[in-house]
Amino acid sequence: MWGNVAPPLVQSYDCSSFDDSPERHPPTVSQYHPDPDLDIIKKAYVYSAKVHQGQLRKSGEPYLVHPLEVAGILGELKLDEASIVTGLLHDTIEDTLATEEELTELFGSEVAHLVDGVTKLSKFSASASLSQEEKQAENFRKMIIAMAQDIRVILVKLADRTHNMRTLDHMSEEKQARIAQETLDIYAPLANRLGISWIKTELEDLSFRYVKPQEFFALQAKLNKRKKEREKYIEDTCDLIRSKLAERGLKGEVSGRFKHVYSIYKKIKSQGIDFDQIHDIIAFRIIAPTAPSCYEALGLVHEMWKPVPGRFKDFIAIPKPNMYQSLHTTIIGPLSERVEVQIRTSEMHKIAEEGIAAHWKYKEGKAVISKDDEKFAWLRQLMEWQQDLKDPKEFLETVKVDLFTDEVFVFTPKGDVRSLPRGATPVDFAYAIHSDVGNRCVGAKVNGKIVPLRYKMKNGDTVEVLTSPQQHPSKDWLTFVKTSRAQQRIRGFIKQQQREKSLQLGRELADRELKRFQLNFNRLLKSGEMKKAAVDLGFRVEDDMLVAIGYGKVTPQQLSHRLVPQEKLNAAEAGGRADANPAATTSGGAGNSVLPGLSRVTDLAKRLVGRSNRSGVQIGGVDDVLVRFGRCCNPVPGDPIAGFITRGRGVTVHTVGCEKALATDPERRVDVSWDVRGDFKRPVTLRVLTADRPGLLADITNTFSKKGVNISQANCRATGDDRAVNTFEVIISDLKQLTDLMRTIERLQGVYSVERI
């Protein structure tokens, strides 16, 4: 870019050369800002032109076009001059020789901080080792952290992505599909959560065009077929509403529009219908002067046309979490077709279009999110999740389920409103109130009637949770709860229960082992000797070590080896009273010792099979042992596992949390581990609860194919309530592949739950 010339050092730029022609003028904020600093915007324009000089975009246009367009979008959002300047400079640190120090000197620390924040969202410290999905997940985590620090960073990023999507034609098809899918998964839902509806709509339609081009252009062609006829219909209907408002002495601006392409596509897919069966592709909007006049206009509309029962929504009384307010009603319109009508005030319309930007833009200093502002409760929830969920992919999946799905609004018995993902159950509602309420939930009343815990709540339901001190979460709840909060709390409780059982089992095994050497377990515990042994085995406290013994990660012999005097160990070995010579363990408590009874199992296995097993599991480092897998839990490589000697059958392998395994005599437990040297596949059965719609089974099987997973058996049946239960036995390489597969299926439209059985 600069050739052999160094970039400009920190200096004063002469803004007199600023081009004032309309097509090159950077966005002005004069029309909406009471006292804008236009000089800094002009200065940023000149600087951006200088440092980007000679750079071209894929389209062949000068690179400067991009920052100008980004700044223009930020101007449409009516943001402050610092945001506009950031839009002009957002690529300077990443793509030129400009530095943060230079930007600080020229434009101040606020702008430099914003530009640096946008730059960091695009950088990965270990990009070479990350998959595209992992990059996307990590990038989203960064966005949430940046958003909590200064919301303008995300608004600039949204503007940047919007212009990039507008010019995506010049990318390769592979990049088009990847960028569009990411936009559909993350940026469009994020714009919706921030309340910026026009960006959300544009990003969805642009993404749809590149993710599913055939469907996009086919649907667009159908919409264009009767476009002029529909435009005339919109004009006539608007005139009719205006005249009726005037007759009543009501003021209001009336407009009509086509619903955007992607929203129509989603309705076709979710309802399993054809385009010809979609009757509400047109919507009308009335902008009234006050909230009370909105309800007056609603009454007039319902007098003119019959409302469709169950299709009225009052978002004025109960705003959406993204601050959206409006009255929604669906009526049987002039041509006997369904038509949606939205009624709101001009202030509500402004918030619907600008969203979060409408609430902070002229406040002094940083646009930092207030911890006390209820409008940002969802963002505070995101911050908590990103701290709790260390895996970026798990964090992203959590957000997609809990925050980026459609919502239902339900009431507590006191009249408080709770927003939950569509498909949420009373158990999700209980955990949304408090973890203790969820843990003790025994039932629920919806609108005064007892309902099953699996009941899917609807808009306007009043939900009362019934609790009992004796109740505790059931593993079965995981098959139907929707929210990640409920899933985490249920898993946490079950894990704690398993820990307590393993702790008790570990104490019994340790006590039994120490008694062989006439040692008292409790005395060693009180004396501190047990603590020393735990630390020596790589644990912080005694309980962690005992839990590991209960799980089978550490053997009782490894403990006795550290507590029993050597002469006693030698005597026991010489006398044949000790079954094994405990070996030294590695740090972390995962040993590789020869276990009690292993030689007998090995001899038995050799007689039975006479060769190495092909199970993918090692028994105490020995390969040639007959191994079976518990059908109750069907472990796959990657699952924590435990082995149990089964007379006449070698060793049976279970997952460590399997209830059958926990109930097995601990004396029969042996140390097992997955053999990482080979590629071993295991059958797993998945139960997928779905809507009963055409094409959904094909979507699921296509997912198996894309993930490289073979189906060995399948059983699909309709349940008679517009649902279907689909059971698949699939061949899985490891736990990571299984988890990824289940999460992908869960994201399919019409899938309610995916369960491993």
Swiss-Prot record:
Residues 63-165 form the HD domain. It catalyses: GTP + ATP = guanosine 3'-diphosphate 5'-triphosphate + AMP. GO terms for cellular component: plasma membrane. Gene3D superfamilies: 3.10.20.30, 3.30.70.260, Beta Polymerase, domain 2, Hypothetical protein af1432. Residues 13-33, 571-592 are annotated as: Disordered. GO terms for molecular function: ATP binding; GTP binding; GTP diphosphokinase activity; guanosine-3',5'-bis(diphosphate) 3'-diphosphatase activity; kinase activity. Residues 406-467 form the TGS domain. Belongs to the RelA/SpoT family. This is GTP pyrophosphokinase. It comes from Myxococcus xanthus.
